């Protein structure tokens, strides 16, 4: 059996979809559904059982349950970069992740967990995952969420007792189906699509940094279908333990993303950006701490044998918009 924590969240439920696509149904989903619409992410999925995250430790005490686990895919976390309760973040993102690490080490099974590109902070030291643990330890996250993720990464490298294989995944800007419950934390594709459908245009921030035109701030946008394909590759192959960037390796601008989204939504490749993009002032409190560039170095991912071409921004956005956002049933 495979445990997927955060299994009703965006990446977790998309990974359950991927497992189902590969014929795997012996899955334990671990999550909290609460009052939001996360339950819709798993409505079409086939899996063995679901358990509340607060009850997993007790469930694993039973030897019959624990001995039946082949791997743990830990996508469960508080992923809100705006969360202010550091104790909650450390308990949820560090303590729980550590508990699952120790379980996988004891059982000698694979452990794949969600780190984050937020650990890189402003990117002063670059976005390179293929460096020593000592170099990774120098990273300076900008928020408590990023710190909670970095703290576990640093802890992991110090452990003598390790899972059979462990992979910490630094996700960059993931977009795609299953993110509808995330509200403000949903991707720019989701928000751009809804802005365009409602207003006929989108708003983008002006630039306050030399070398970047208005709306041309850059991010590494990666489609969730590519993300879960990489995760599946790591699950079924023996790959080197460690930290891996999960991105496309090619930064694109918010202008590119917005135009790709609106062109896909309108089925019109000739939209003029001057007519559908409104540039607005960036709030003053953001101007000094706004990231203008992120781009994953993915050489390390390629070196372990993952050679598939990922969706281009235009390909991924078109699939997401036309086959999901525009449909009555927008779920995988």
From Swiss-Prot:
Catalytic residues (UniProt): 145 (proton acceptor), 182 (proton acceptor)
Domains as described in the record: Contains a large N-terminal NADP-binding domain, and a smaller C-terminal substrate-binding domain.
Gene Ontology biological process terms in this record: ADP-L-glycero-beta-D-manno-heptose biosynthetic process; carbohydrate metabolic process
Protein name, UniProt field: ADP-L-glycero-D-manno-heptose-6-epimerase
Segments crossing the lipid bilayer: none
Residue numbers binding substrate: 173, 184, 191, 205-208, 219, 290
Cofactor field: NADP(+)
Originating species: Fusobacterium nucleatum subsp. nucleatum (strain ATCC 25586 / DSM 15643 / BCRC 10681 / CIP 101130 / JCM 8532 / KCTC 2640 / LMG 13131 / VPI 4355)
Family statement drawn from the similarity comment of this UniProt entry: Belongs to the NAD(P)-dependent epimerase/dehydratase family. HldD subfamily.
Superkingdom: Bacteria
Pathway: Nucleotide-sugar biosynthesis; ADP-L-glycero-beta-D-manno-heptose biosynthesis; ADP-L-glycero-beta-D-manno-heptose from D-glycero-beta-D-manno-heptose 7-phosphate: step 4/4
Coiled coil as UniProt keyword: no
SUBUNIT field: Homopentamer.
Gene Ontology terms, MF aspect: ADP-glyceromanno-heptose 6-epimerase activity; NADP binding
Reaction(s) the record says it catalyses: ADP-D-glycero-beta-D-manno-heptose = ADP-L-glycero-beta-D-manno-heptose
HAMAP family named in the record: Heptose_epimerase
EC number(s) recorded for this UniProt protein: 5.1.3.20
Cofactor descriptive note: Binds 1 NADP(+) per subunit.
Binding site for NADP(+): 10-11, 31-32, 38, 53, 75-79, 92, 149, 174, 182
Keywords in alphabetical order: Carbohydrate metabolism, Isomerase, NADP
SUPFAM superfamilies per UniProt: NAD(P)-binding Rossmann-fold domains
């Amino acid at each position: 059996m495979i445990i997927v924590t955060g299994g009703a969240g965006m990446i977790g439920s998309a990974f359950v979809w991927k497992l189902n696509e590969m014929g795997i149904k012996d899955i334990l989903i671990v999550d909290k559904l609460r009052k939001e619409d996360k339950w819709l992410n798993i409505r079409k999925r086939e899996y063995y059982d679901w358990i509340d995250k607060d009850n997993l430790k007790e469930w694993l005490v039973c030897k019959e349950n624990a001995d039946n686990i082949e791997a743990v895919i830990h996508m469960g976390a508080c992923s809100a970069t705006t969360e202010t309760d550091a104790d909650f973040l450390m308990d949820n993102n560090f303590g729980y992740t550590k508990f699952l690490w120790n379980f996988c080490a004891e059982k000698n099974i694979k452990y794949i967990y969600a780190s984050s590109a937020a650990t890189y902070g402003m990117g002063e030291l670059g976005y390179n995952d293929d460096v020593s643990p000592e170099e990774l330890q120098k990273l300076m996250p900008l928020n408590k969420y990023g710190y909670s993720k970095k703290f576990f990464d640093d802890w992991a490298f110090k452990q003598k007792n390790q899972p059979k294989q462990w992979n910490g995944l630094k996700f960059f800007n993931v977009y795609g189906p299953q993110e509808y419950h995330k509200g403000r934390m949903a991707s720019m594709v989701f928000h751009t699509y809804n802005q365009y459908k409602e207003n006929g245009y989108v708003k983008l921030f002006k630039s306050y940094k030399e070398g970047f035109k208005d709306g041309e701030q850059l991010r590494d946008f990666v489609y969730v279908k590519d993300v879960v394909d990489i995760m599946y590759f790591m699950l079924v192959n023996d790959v080197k333990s460690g930290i891996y960037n999960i991105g496309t390796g090619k930064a694109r601008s918010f202008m590119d993303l917005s135009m790709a989204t609106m062109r896909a939504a309108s089925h019109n490749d000739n939209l003029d950006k001057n007519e559908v993009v409104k540039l607005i002032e960036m709030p003053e409190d953001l101007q000094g701490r706004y990231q203008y560039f992120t781009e994953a170095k993915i050489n390390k991912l390629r070196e372990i044998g993952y050679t598939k071409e990922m969706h281009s921004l235009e390909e991924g956005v078109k699939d997401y918009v036309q086959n999901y956002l525009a449909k009555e049933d927008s779920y995988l």
